[in-house]
């Protein structure tokens, strides 16, 4: 692994990744809990739809300001305290306005979203998304100040709160109601609220983290709003809103369009419930991308600040990123029998959708590549290209879903995500080489993709009835791929944590 910069990036990725991976894994366990309790796929489809809308509005309410915050905090000519204060005040005001707007227009909003039976679900999550948007700047401040442990602790606190209150409302309270009918708690618990308790648990957890976050990031904060600075921030950040929309649509396009392309909302929610539950298994790719992103943005902005040519570091980061995501892809697909067993045990009605998984994971991989490539227009302040790519991606996603989902079903959503991210990544690469040339190791990157594809086909194609023999056969290909990677580009003595053992036995 080349250079001290890569070791620093790997170390930060490991710290952020620990919280991201642990948090995502813990949060993932809510999916089995939910589908085992709400066996009707329509109910889980409603949950998925609301969270898809929440993700979309979170991007809209942060309007790219998180990345703009990093950019301006690293500019020598800008006052860091003023950047923080201006960003915080701006996003706080827009979040408050969003809550007030949602309260005043909840009826037409729920009708427009085709979610009229439980408007309170929308209202609860409107408050949640506004609070989440406000907290993006304090969390970004922790990253900027190189406080990954505090950042990780607060992120994990939310996960633990959320899991606790989900278990409290969905498991403990029903058990108390059945075992002890006269218990005082039963007066406040109403089982017919159903999935509403999922959203209520989220709201309580968000408020708890906000209370913990404020003393850490706002102690001694000077209120200093600079209108001129805000204009520069928005000019830089607003095009990144489109980039953010591309990312969120890549993950939530089904939740956004299904209610409008099926004959009934119930059928849309049924298909969405199956699709969403199975796509959750691609979380291992997305959480690695998230961990990498947390470390990579401060890394490349910080590198750019020192005025040196760091394109070699960016190229190395891309190659190692691709190596790891391909390894993750092969691990998940080679042991998909375990996933199938889990799904049949906890949610038989959902298991039929697992055929979406390879396409969903490849879609995530190419979105990660696209994020890596975005370094060229972020560092050259040509963020308008991010907007162009995002608009193109949105069009591809929406058109493919509208045209193909009614014919082929939910699997077409996974195809659309894969195709969209592949296309915009390719276009970004070719345009980026014109404005900010980076010599990526295309030869080895292409080789690893070919090897992964060949090994995947060779491992998955033979029909081996015995499960242990089947997984053992596939494991041989996984070992072979890992051995090639280690031999060519990833000596074990250079990997953080593992390298300690090599030093010990030298």
Regions found by a protein language model. Name each.
Residues 61-77, 278, 282-319, 374-379:
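Helix-loop junctions and terminal segments of transmembrane helices
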Residues 2, 461-506:
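Membrane-proximal transmembrane or re-entrant/amphipathic helices at the cytosolic face
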Residues 5-66, 95-105, 128, 163, ...:
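Signature of the first transmembrane helix
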Residues 1-28, 78-81, 85, 227-243, ...:
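N-terminal membrane topogenesis motif
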Residues 12-27, 198-213, 217, 227-301, ...:
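Transmembrane helical elements of multi-pass membrane transporters/channels
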Residues 123, 153-218, 391-396, 410-431, ...:
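Hydrophobic alpha-helical transmembrane segments
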Residues 1-5, 9, 176-197, 210-251, ...:
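Interhelical loop/hinge segments that connect adjacent transmembrane helices in multipass membrane
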Residues 41, 107-125, 269, 332-365:
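Interfacial segments at transmembrane-helix termini and the short loops linking adjacent helices
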